[in-house]
Structures are given as structure tokens and as C-alpha cells.
């Protein structure tokens, strides 16, 4: 805990926050340090809030690993249904991409093992 009462170990890196903020704004827009700090605090707290809820679900089910479904359930439980819908689409696309990558890797590996 710092002198100002904040735990900086649980904050997202300010450079990452600023980069995401800039990507959502017009090219010539400026962002104050105060705005970056405020968003950094908010998104870090939001992640902790959702993760805590997802962790409770895991604990109830005697599991140790939080899954994408746990995060979706946490978002719905906490009243963030709109975010859950968008995240579900992203999670599906991510899993499809992972499956394609695994399939391509498997195909490449089996071809390299074939006798020539």
C-alpha cells in the first residue's frame, strides 16, 4: 500500500491503458494524465470485481481454475449482461482460432513425420 492509500500492484500498466484509450479516440485527441490514472483505477477495479465473483463460483464448485464460462456467469450475475454477450462472441472466436491453430500444427507435424 502506498502513502496515498492505493495498492499499485493490482493496477494495469498505464501504458497499456493509454494505448487502449487512444485507440478509441480520434487521432488528434489528447488524454490528460488524470484521465489515464482514473481509467487505470476503474478498469483495474472492474477486473478485480469480476474475477472475485468468478472465483466464488469456482470455490462453490470446488475448482481452482477460473474459466471463460465463469467470467461470463460473473458478468451476468453482476448485471453486466451486455458485456457478457460481447465477451461470449469473442470467447467463441478465440476458441475457434485456437482449434484452427492446433489443427494446423498437428497437420504440419504429421507431414514432417511422413517418410520421404
UniProtKB/Swiss-Prot annotation:
Keyword Transcription attributed: yes
GO terms for cellular component: CCAAT-binding factor complex; chromatin
Coarse class of the protein's main subcellular location: nucleus
GO molecular-function terms, A-Z: DNA-binding transcription activator activity, RNA polymerase II-specific; DNA-binding transcription factor activity, RNA polymerase II-specific; protein heterodimerization activity; sequence-specific DNA binding
Compartments, as annotated in UniProt: Nucleus
A Pfam family that the UniProt record links to this protein: CBFD_NFYB_HMF
Keyword Protein transport applies: no
The protein's name: Transcriptional activator hap3
Amino acid at each position: 500500500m502506498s502513502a496515498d492509500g492505493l495498492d499499485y500492484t493490482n493496477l494495469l500498466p498505464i501504458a497499456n491503458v493509454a494505448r487502449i484509450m487512444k485507440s478509441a479516440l480520434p487521432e488528434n485527441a489528447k488524454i490528460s494524465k488524470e484521465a489515464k490514472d482514473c481509467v487505470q483505477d476503474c478498469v483495474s477495479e472492474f477486473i478485480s470485481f469480476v474475477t472475485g465473483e468468478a472465483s466464488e463460483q469456482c470455490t462453490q464448485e470446488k475448482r481452482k481454475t477460473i474459466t471463460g464460462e465463469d467470467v461470463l456467469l460473473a458478468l451476468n450475475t453482476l448485471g453486466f449482461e451486455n458485456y457478457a454477450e460481447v465477451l461470449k462472441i469473442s470467447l467463441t472466436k478465440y476458441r475457434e482460432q485456437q482449434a484452427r491453430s492446433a489443427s494446423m500444427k498437428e497437420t504440419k507435424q504429421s507431414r514432417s513425420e511422413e517418410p520421404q
